[in-house]
């Protein structure tokens, strides 16, 4: 019998009931050929990996900086899903406890979940040790928690801001477990524009109103240039006696105030 005639015969493994397929022969197409081709049992060739079908683009602008009167925290309120604006009223500053604030940049669900979990861990720490957790310890807790999931698709870039026995504290933590202490940070797609304003106007000796104006101006400039940032500017001030919410200004109103300004 010729070899060609053997290869042309249909494979019996695709009959109804074999391997519990119930007649779905298409489920056992192991190779590049059709199920009736004898070559269908050959190992599949290595091809080009399939590209992700959906690419979610993250966009936001958040900032925080330390100065002699505490820590200023500001953020926009726009949430995007790819090229679509999902919301204009997202609260991107998370109130962890009366002395700690966190910001959201990256995946909204990731940031919200991990910072709310951090709030519970901070409360447990206080109950066990009978004292407030420090800003450094809180940021280290968050970094340790997310590091366990490194490489698993988390998307988070947050700033932990607060006041403890050492004074004002500011740390940047991301989903890779990185943790950095600093005086000024801006995170998000509009951060390059916010940094431009902060680098020019920031000083540790700023007065309170000057610091408020600098934060508003920095977020406004980011929303003006970055399509993924917008909505309103939420402004917080962390002081020795706890944080306060200073204001929430629509960027359209800030445009009337700052457009044409040269500084």
From Swiss-Prot:
GO terms for molecular function: endopeptidase activity; threonine-type endopeptidase activity. This is Proteasome subunit beta type-5. The active site is at 60 (nucleophile). The keyword Hydrolase applies. Component of the 20S core proteasome complex involved in the proteolytic degradation of most intracellular proteins. This complex plays numerous essential roles within the cell by associating with different regulatory particles. Associated with two 19S regulatory particles, forms the 26S proteasome and thus participates in the ATP-dependent degradation of ubiquitinated proteins. The gene is PSMB5. It comes from the Eukaryota. Bortezomib binds at residue 108. The keyword Membrane does not apply. InterPro entries: Ntn_hydrolases_N, Pept_T1A_subB, Proteasome_bsu_CS, Proteasome_sua/b, Proteasome_suB-type. Belongs to the peptidase T1B family. The 26S proteasome consists of a 20S proteasome core and two 19S regulatory subunits. The 20S proteasome core is a barrel-shaped complex made of 28 subunits that are arranged in four stacked rings. The two outer rings are each formed by seven alpha subunits, and the two inner rings are formed by seven beta subunits. The proteolytic activity is exerted by three beta-subunits PSMB5, PSMB6 and PSMB7. Directly interacts with POMP. Interacts with ABCB1 and TAP1. It catalyses: Cleavage of peptide bonds with very broad specificity. It is an enzyme of class 3 (hydrolase). Keywords: Cytoplasm, Hydrolase, Nucleus, Protease, Proteasome, Threonine protease, Zymogen. Its EC number is 3.4.25.1. GO terms for cellular component: centrosome; cytosol; nucleoplasm; nucleus; proteasome core complex; proteasome core complex, beta-subunit complex. The lineage of its organism: Eukaryota, Metazoa, Chordata, Craniata, Vertebrata. GO terms for biological process: proteasome-mediated ubiquitin-dependent protein catabolic process; response to oxidative stress. It is found in: Cytoplasm; Nucleus. Residues 1-59 form a propeptide. It comes from Bos taurus (Bovine).
């Amino acid at each position: 019998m010729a070899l060609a005639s053997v290869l042309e015969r249909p494979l019996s493994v695709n009959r109804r009931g074999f391997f519990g397929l119930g007649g779905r022969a298409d489920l056992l197409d192991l190779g590049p050929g059709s199920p009736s081709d004898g070559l269908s049992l050959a190992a599949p060739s290595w091809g080009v990996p399939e590209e992700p079908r959906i690419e979610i683009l993250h966009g936001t602008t958040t900032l925080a900086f330390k100065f002699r009167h505490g820590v200023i925290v500001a953020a926009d309120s726009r949430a995007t899903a790819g090229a679509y604006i999902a919301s204009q009223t997202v609260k991107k500053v998370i109130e962890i406890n009366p002395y700690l604030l966190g910001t959201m940049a990256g995946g909204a669900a990731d940031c919200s979940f991990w910072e709310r979990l951090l709030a519970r861990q901070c409360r447990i720490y206080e109950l066990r040790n009978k004292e407030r957790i420090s800003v450094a310890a809180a940021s280290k807790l968050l970094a340790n928690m997310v590091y366990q999931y490194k490489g698993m698709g988390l998307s988070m870039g947050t700033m932990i801001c607060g006041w403890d026995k050492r004074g004002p504290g500011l740390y940047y933590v991301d989903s890779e477990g990185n943790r950095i202490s600093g005086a000024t940070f801006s995170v998000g797609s509009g951060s390059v524009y916010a940094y431009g304003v902060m680098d020019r106007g920031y000083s540790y000796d700023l007065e309170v109103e000057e610091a408020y104006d600098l934060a508003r101006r920095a977020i406004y400039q980011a929303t003006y240039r970055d399509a993924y940032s917008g909505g309103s500017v939420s402004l917080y001030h962390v002081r020795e006696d706890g944080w306060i919410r200073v204001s929430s200004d629509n960027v359209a109103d800030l445009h009337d105030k700052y457009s044409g300004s040269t500084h």
